[in-house]
Amino acid sequence: MNAIESTKHYKERIKTEVDNTLIETNFPKGVKKTGKVRDQYELEDKIALITTDRQSAFDRVLASIPFKGQVLNLTSAWWFDKTKHIIPNHVLKIPDPNVTLAKKCKVFPIEFVVRGYITGSTSTSLWTVYNNGDREYCGNKLPEGLKKNQKLDKNMLTPTTKEEHHDRPISPKDIVEEGWMTEEDWEYCSKKALELFAFGQETALKNGMILVDTKYEMGKDTSGDIVLIDEIHTPDSSRYWIAESYNDRIKNNQEPQNIDKELSLIHI
């Protein structure tokens, strides 16, 4: 395939490839596990993560988008490299735009969701919960008078469990008491999640974007070290707004301009 030489060619190229998407994989080596977006192959001493073009929402695969897998995988690769001073990660090699070879890890059954703004449209989003009258969420106290899409006084960690059918919000206290993680591991991971998010916000703002919220996953490698895994700061795992127009749109009671999969969530 020919390379895209400038951003003005993106739309044209995507249109030509609309029927040429990576929907599924089938390799003879390794034990295959199929996720909503990624296919994972467990090899002898590592795993191969193949990011497809599948588009998911509300735990369902809805469609496919040309080059989506490449965007997600290469975005993660960039951020993994830029954040390794905060926490090591599972990446061994990026042999293809859609593929990451990674360390085998024992994954913590908790997703570390960090939020900088009160927003969202799903049943577990901070705004939905707040608008329904709750003033405590995942162990965080919420003040009266917050408005949708408002910046929080400080970044907030709202963890969820990783369960087969549906994740559920959980407090740090319950994470430890229910045995999801040890207190020591939780303290370390929660600290790193907040550090990663602060760095992500700073970097995004330098590039004209607001990193609104995101999720991280972590696990222990074969040496017992805690590492960052899965993906980081992608349009699938994160919410991004355009910084330049944010204040004016809030003043005019308009939704912020977003560049993530929130549009598909709202549509559904």
Each language-model region and where it sits:
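Active-site loop/lid in soluble adenylation, ligation, and acyl-transfer enzymes
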Residues: H9, I14-T160
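A short mid-domain helix/strand-loop element embedded in enzyme catalytic domains
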Residues: K151-E183
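A long amphipathic alpha-helix within ATP-dependent nucleotide-binding catalytic cores
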Residues: M181-V212
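Catalytic activation segment of kinase domains across protein kinase-like and atypical kinase folds
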Residues: E217-N258
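Conserved small/polar residues in nucleotide/adenosyl-binding loops
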Residues: I266-I268
